[in-house]
Amino acid sequence: MPMQHQAPVSDMAQQAASCELPGRMFRAYDIRGIVGRDLTEDNIRVIGQAIGYLALSHGHNEVLFGADGRLSSPSLSAALGEGILDSGCHIIDLGTIPTPLLYFATHTTDYHSGVMLTASHNPADYNGIKIVRERSCLTSEEIQGIREQACFFARRPDKVREPRLPRGSRRALDIMPAYIDRIRQDVKLKRPLRVVVDCGNAVPGLVAPSLYRALGCEVIELYCQLDGSFPNHHPDPTINVNLKDLVAQVKTHSADLGVALDGDGDRVVLVTDQGRVMDTDRLLMLLVDQILPGYCATAEDRRPSVVFDVKCSSLLINRI
């Protein structure tokens, strides 16, 4: 892909220094801000142009595209998509989906780059962008590169697309059936479970109840109707006060398990049949106990590696 759209590094740095795109939006691994103050339709469009340019510069002329169910997502999604198309990059539109479905699509389709409009577990007045290139999240340096390129395009809209390159096009792809089918193949329950699923009125409500029913569970839905104002509780299950209704429903229905998902479905907290909130360390220990023995039995040539974040305690390390 020709690189003539990119300004010299010194020019881009100067553009970024005077750019109206707030630097606070461009975080270590994603882009996130308050709608109307940080994220507007105008600035998210030039960010889309920069994302499209990034994909094209790495040889990808098609990107997967999804959005969560926030109130601001329809308008911002339209603007972000227009920016990507401006660059000459094509969009494979996954529609309104949880983030894990975008990640799944990058690993199971021919399209290895993707863009997700979401602010994850943040309050309703936030929105943001998660970017995947070659099946991996961007580094902080690459995120800053997106800002610099977007600032350049804001000043020089004539440079957004190489003159001989036509504007991009869009087509739809329904990834949910393949996602559910893949999990159904991998997960076999020893007995049917009664599960309370709390989606916090966020986008996981479009997928999670169907997924658990496909696994043979009896599902009691709690706040699974999509409402981007999040009227019942903040969509962050790692805060215990947001779990009180789930705990109560698990006890009321004598459920085997409670499942709470965050605003875009990439965080989960479990509640036991006794109404006890299971912390992340304990959940990971259960997964380690289930996964590692089978892995070690089939991978005699090397020891397995386990990746976990810095918030995990030494209890998990000792268990591994």
Protein language model regions, located:
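Short beta-strand-to-turn element immediately C-terminal to the catalytic PLP-Schiff-base lysine
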Residues: 131-134, 269-273
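N-terminal small/polar loop signature for handling phosphorylated ligands or for N-terminal nucleophile
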Residues: 57-126, 181, 211-271
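A short, N-terminal amphipathic alpha-helix
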Residues: 47-60, 248-252, 289-298
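Gly/Ser/Thr-enriched, mixed-charge loops and adjacent short helices
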Residues: 127-253
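Short, surface-exposed alpha-helical segments at coil->helix boundaries
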Residues: 73-78, 143, 205-209, 317
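Proline/glycine-rich low-complexity loops and linkers
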Residues: 101, 144-181, 185, 273-320
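Residues that mark the start of a beta-strand
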Residues: 60-64, 192-196, 218, 302-305
